[in-house]
């Protein structure tokens, strides 16, 4: 959603106070029997009985405090709060996300068909090379829980969302065209190239800097804090100037692209920027000093 943890909890608090969602400061995965029954009715009515699958979740975290239900909508009949007074754009977006994820939790998994295509070639001695061009294509056979996202996208809220919805038919057409191409392919058939293009790419660093959201996820994985404290923890390290949220521009690098077409090799040079970060958390000099002090003196608990 592009919303900070602090603002997310503030928005969730308003939704809770207005009776739209249940208590949000919980790490429980449990849903009440009444809620499960209401979800079942909604899924069967909205998507059909083929999409419903009852699932009862249990937290794997031994320290989980399941005193409340999982955060969920109070009324499953409302997938959006559009039209209600005093409901902001962001409040509606968060509510719709909670509604969608809750519905998905009681729906069948999606089924995907994966087709792999390998194109080999012969070397100068007319021997088949061990190297292959490999391509994989996924087709959704049964959309399952993904069907709930179609309801999430029903209302057009921004020009950006309108553009996405306008592009969907084109995406569906690409899927259909892709299937038609695959149907024409046969095992061991000969094929000739029309164009072969190789483009230079730079891989991203495996350990990216934290965003506020990814930091919360990491805290949860490490068992540090609780849902009620994540927001304040992320805010505190920024308020104390241990870290700062900022964006940095990447450096410009050259890319070499090679194209083989009509038995002619064409080399082209492009430029791109790498190493940039947007809205990431960076340690400050104070943060680095505090971190070193903690490691030197409290290494056994860090």
State where each predicted segment sits.
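Core catalytic DNA strand-manipulation module of type IA topoisomerases
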Residues: 1-302
